[in-house]
C-alpha cells in the first residue's frame, strides 16, 4: 500500500514538473552552482553583471574550444615510440643461402640451346649496328649473316628491335632478324603506347623488347633500355622464364645445385653441422636454396654470447664455372637473414657474398611492436587481409611481401589467364609460357607497369603488428690468402661427405666463407604505446574546466541537472499546450452549453 502511494506521488511530481519558470530556474542555478562566475552575474550591479556575464561566456567558450581540441586529439589515436637497446639470449636468425645461378648450365644446356644461339646472334647484330647506320641492318638471308640456320620460333614470340631516334618525332623500328617486309623500317602505330624508359637523348639508337598482343585488336609496346647488355639480359630472363615454366618442379630441383655439393663445411658455435641441418626450398629466382635454423621441423637455436665464435660459420662452393652465361652475370652466394618460419624473399631483401672472400656479418635485431586497431591498420597474422596468401603452401607466417606477391599473382591470373613463374600458383592455375599463352609477356608487362593494379595491392595488404628485422654490419677480406691457397687441404674437397671419386679441386673463384654472429648489443626494441588514453582525456578535460571556470565533475552534474529541468519544463509546457488546443477544438464543435437535467426531463415529458 505504501509503495502504491509512493508511485502515485512520483507520478504527480512528474506531471507537476520542477515548479519553476525558466527564469526562476536559471536564477536558482546561478545562485547555487559551485562554478565560479555565475553567482556574480545575479548579485552584482548592472555594469558588473554585464562584465561577469561576458567573462563567464568567454571562458565557457574557451573551455568548449579546448575540449574540442582534446577530444579530436584523443580520437586521432596517435602513438608514441620508445627505444630500448641491450643484449639478451635470443633466437639465432634463420639463414637462407642460395647460389647466384639458379641452375647448372651443364644440366639445362639442352633446354637453352636455341635461346643461346639467338642471343649470340642478336649480340652480334647489335654490335654491327654500332658500326653502321641503323637502317642498313642486314636481313636474315644476307650472305654476311653468320647465323643462317637459326630457329626464329622464340624470336618471333618476343623479338628484340633497334629504335633509331635520329628523328625524335618519327622514330624508326628495325627488327634485328627481319623475316618479312612489314617490319623493316616500320614506324610505331599511333595507337601504340609511347616508348617507355627513354632516359638518354644523346643516344640515337636503343635496344628494346617488342611485346605484342595477338588478340582481336593487336597492340604492341616497346620496353627499351639504357644499355644493350641490360636489354639482352632482361630479354633472356623473360624467354628462359617461359621455358622453365613448362618443366615440372622435381626436374628443376635436379637441375640446380645440390646441398652436398654447395655446403662444404658448417659450424654453429662449437658444434659441427652439415648440409643435413639445412632445410631445402626451391626459389624461382635462385633455384635450390637451403635454410639453416628455419624452425619449421625442429626447435630454433638460441645464442647467448656475442662474437664470431658463437655464431654460424659456413664454407660454400658456388662452382661458377657452371653458371649460365647469359642468365647470371653475378658470381657469388645470395643469402638472407630472416625470422623463423618466414619465407625468404631473397630478390628484394637478400645480399650477395662475393667469391674468394671471407664475409663476416654482425647482426643486430630490430624488434618492431606496433599498436593495432584503431591506432594503425596492421594485422597480427594476416587473417583479416582480403588477399589469399599463396605462400601458405610453405607453412610460413604472414608478411607484407607474401601478400603483395600473392595479390599480383591473383591479378595476373585474372588479367592474363595464367600465373607468373616467380610466384606460387593458385589452385587450378598453370604457369604462363609463350606456346600456350602467346600474349602473356605483353599482359605481364602491362600489368607490371599499371599504377592502378599496384595501388590496389598496396591498399589491400597490411603490415604485421609485430615484426623482426635484421640489421647487418658486413666486412670482407680475401680468402684464402695466397699462402693458404698452397695448402693441400685447399686442393681437395673440404668435406669428407663430398664425392671423393671425382678429381675435384677448389679455387678462390668458387669458394666463399661466411661468419654470422650477434654483435655486442644484439637487440633494439622499438615499441609503440598509445599517446593519449581515456585517463589522459578525462584529466585534461577536468584540468581545462578547473583552470578556466574553477569547476569540477560535480559542477558538470549540476549543469546536467538544470538541463534536465529545462527539458522537463519544456515537455510539460508542450503537453499543456496540446491539451489546451484539444479543448479549444472541442468547444468550437459544440458552441452551446450542454442541457441541464431538468431541461432533459421536460423535453422527455413533452414528447
UniProtKB/Swiss-Prot annotation:
Keyword DNA repair applies: no
Q: Which GO terms describe its cellular component?
A: apical plasma membrane; cytoplasmic vesicle membrane; external side of plasma membrane; extracellular exosome; sodium channel complex
Function noted in UniProt: This is one of the three pore-forming subunits of the heterotrimeric epithelial sodium channel (ENaC), a critical regulator of sodium balance and fluid homeostasis. ENaC operates in epithelial tissues, where it mediates the electrodiffusion of sodium ions from extracellular fluid through the apical membrane of cells, with water following osmotically. It plays a key role in maintaining sodium homeostasis through electrogenic sodium reabsorption in the kidneys. Additionally, ENaC is essential for airway surface liquid homeostasis, which is crucial for proper mucus clearance.
Those parts of the protein on the Cytoplasmic side are 1-50, 573-607
Q: Got any disulfides in this one, which pairs?
A: 98-289, 212-220, 266-273, 378-465, 403-461, 407-457, 416-443, 418-432
Where is this protein chiefly located?
A: membrane
Protein name as it appears in the record: Epithelial sodium channel subunit beta
Upper lineage ranks?
A: Eukaryota, Metazoa, Chordata, Craniata, Vertebrata
Residues assigned to the Extracellular compartment are: 72-551
Is Protein transport included in the keywords of this UniProt record?
A: no
What's this protein's family per the entry? Belongs to the amiloride-sensitive sodium channel (TC 1.A.6) family. SCNN1B subfamily.
How is this chain's activity regulated?
Originally identified and characterized by its inhibition by the diuretic drug amiloride.
PANTHER family for this protein: AMILORIDE-SENSITIVE SODIUM CHANNEL SUBUNIT BETA (PTHR11690:SF18), AMILORIDE-SENSITIVE SODIUM CHANNEL-RELATED (PTHR11690)
Q: How does it assemble?
A: Component of the heterotrimeric epithelial sodium channel (ENaC) composed of an alpha/SCNN1A, a beta/SCNN1B and a gamma/SCNN1G subunit.
Q: Which GO terms describe its biological process?
A: aldosterone metabolic process; artery smooth muscle contraction; cellular response to acidic pH; cellular response to aldosterone; epithelial fluid transport; erythrocyte homeostasis; gene expression; intracellular sodium ion homeostasis
Subcellular location(s) of the protein: Apical cell membrane; Cytoplasmic vesicle membrane
Query: Which catalytic reaction applies to this protein?
Result: Na(+)(in) = Na(+)(out)
Name residues in a coiled coil: none
Keywords from UniProt, A to Z, are: Cell membrane, Cytoplasmic vesicle, Disulfide bond, Ion channel, Ion transport, Membrane, Sodium, Sodium channel, Sodium transport, Transmembrane, Transmembrane helix, Transport
Q: Which residues cross the membrane?
A: 51-71, 552-572
Q: Which GO terms describe its molecular function?
A: ligand-gated sodium channel activity; WW domain binding
Q: How is it placed in the membrane, per its record?
A: Multi-pass membrane protein
Amino acid at each position: 500500500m505504501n509503495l502504491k502511494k509512493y508511485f502515485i506521488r512520483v507520478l504527480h511530481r512528474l506531471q507537476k514538473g520542477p515548479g519553476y519558470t525558466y527564469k526562476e530556474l536559471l536564477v536558482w542555478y546561478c545562485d547555487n552552482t559551485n562554478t565560479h562566475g555565475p553567482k556574480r552575474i545575479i548579485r552584482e550591479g548592472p555594469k558588473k553583471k554585464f562584465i561577469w556575464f561576458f567573462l563567464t561566456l568567454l571562458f565557457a567558450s574557451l573551455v568548449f574550444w579546448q575540449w574540442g581540441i582534446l577530444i579530436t586529439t584523443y580520437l586521432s589515436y596517435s602513438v608514441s615510440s620508445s627505444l630500448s637497446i641491450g643484449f639478451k639470449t635470443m633466437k639465432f636468425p634463420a639463414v637462407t643461402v642460395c647460389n647466384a645461378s639458379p641452375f647448372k648450365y651443364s644440366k639445362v644446356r639442352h633446354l637453352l640451346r636455341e635461346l643461346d644461339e639467338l642471343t649470340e646472334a642478336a649480340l652480334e647484330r647489335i654490335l654491327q649496328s654500332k658500326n653502321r647506320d641503323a637502317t642498313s641492318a642486314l636481313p636474315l638471308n644476307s650472305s654476311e649473316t653468320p647465323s643462317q640456320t637459326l630457329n626464329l620460333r622464340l624470336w618471333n614470340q618476343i623479338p628484340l628491335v633497334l629504335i633509331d631516334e635520329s628523328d625524335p618525332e618519327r622514330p624508326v623500328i628495325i627488327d634485328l632478324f627481319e623475316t618479312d617486309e612489314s617490319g623493316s623500317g616500320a614506324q610505331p602505330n599511333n595507337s601504340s603506347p609511347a616508348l617507355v624508359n627513354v632516359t638518354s637523348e644523346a643516344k640515337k639508337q636503343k635496344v628494346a623488347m617488342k611485346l605484342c598482343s595477338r588478340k582481336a585488336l593487336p597492340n604492341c609496346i616497346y620496353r627499351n633500355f639504357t644499355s644493350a647488355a641490360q636489354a639482352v639480359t632482361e630479354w633472356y630472363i623473360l624467354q628462359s622464364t617461359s621455358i622453365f615454366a613448362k618443366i615440372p618442379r622435381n626436374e628443376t630441383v635436379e637441375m640446380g645445385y645440390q646441398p652436398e655439393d654447395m655446403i662444404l663445411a658448417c659450424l654453429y658455435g662449437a658444434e659441427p653441422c652439415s648440409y643435413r641441418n639445412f632445410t631445402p626450398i626451391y626459389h624461382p629466382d635462385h633455384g635450390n636454396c637451403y635454410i639453416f635454423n628455419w624452425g619449421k621441423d625442429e626447435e630454433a637455436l638460441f645464442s647467448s654470447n656475442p662474437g664470431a665464435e658463437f655464431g654460424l660459420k659456413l664454407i660454400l662452393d658456388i662452382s661458377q664455372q657452371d653458371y649460365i652465361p647469359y642468365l647470371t652475370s653475378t658470381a657469388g652466394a645470395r643469402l638472407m637473414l630472416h625470422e623463423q618460419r618466414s619465407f625468404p624473399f631473397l630478390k628484394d631483401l637478400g645480399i650477395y657474398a662475393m667469391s674468394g672472400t671471407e664475409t663476416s656479418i654482425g647482426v643486430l635485431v630490430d624488434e618492431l611492436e606496433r599498436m593495432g586497431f584503431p591506432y594503425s591498420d596492421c594485422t597480427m597474422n594476416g587473417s583479416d587481409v582480403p588477399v589469399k596468401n599463396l605462400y601458405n603452401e610453405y607453412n610460413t607466417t604472414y608478411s607484407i611481401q607474401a601478400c603483395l606477391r600473392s595479390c599480383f599473382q591473383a591479378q595476373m591470373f585474372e588479367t592474363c589467364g595464367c600465373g607468373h613463374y616467380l610466384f606460387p600458383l593458385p589452385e587450378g592455375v598453370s604457369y604462363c609460357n609463350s606456346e600456350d599463352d602467346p600474349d602473356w609477356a605483353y599482359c605481364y608487362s602491362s600489368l607490371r607497369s599499371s599504377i592502378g593494379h599496384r595501388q590496389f595491392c598496396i591498399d589491400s595488404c597490411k603490415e604485421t603488428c609485430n615484426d623482426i628485422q635484421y640489421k647487418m654490419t658486413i666486412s670482407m677480406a680475401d680468402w684464402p690468402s695466397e699462402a693458404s691457397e698452397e695448402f693441400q687441404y685447399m686442393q681437395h674437397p673440404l668435406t669428407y661427405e663430398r664425392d671423393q671419386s671425382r678429381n675435384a679441386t677448389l679455387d678462390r673463384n668458387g669458394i666463399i666463407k661466411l661468419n654470422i654472429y650477434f654483435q655486442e648489443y644484439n637487440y633494439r626494441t622499438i615499441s609503440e604505446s598509445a599517446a593519449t588514453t581515456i585517463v589522459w582525456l578525462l584529466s585534461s578535460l577536468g584540468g581545462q574546466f578547473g583552470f578556466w571556470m574553477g569547476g569540477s565533475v560535480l559542477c558538470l552534474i549540476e549543469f546536467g541537472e538544470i538541463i534536465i529541468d529545462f527539458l522537463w519544463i519544456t515537455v510539460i509546457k508542450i503537453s499543456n499546450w496540446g491539451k489546451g488546443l484539444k479543448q479549444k477544438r472541442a468547444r468550437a464543435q459544440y458552441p452551446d452549453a450542454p442541457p441541464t437535467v431538468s431541461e432533459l426531463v421536460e423535453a422527455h415529458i413533452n414528447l
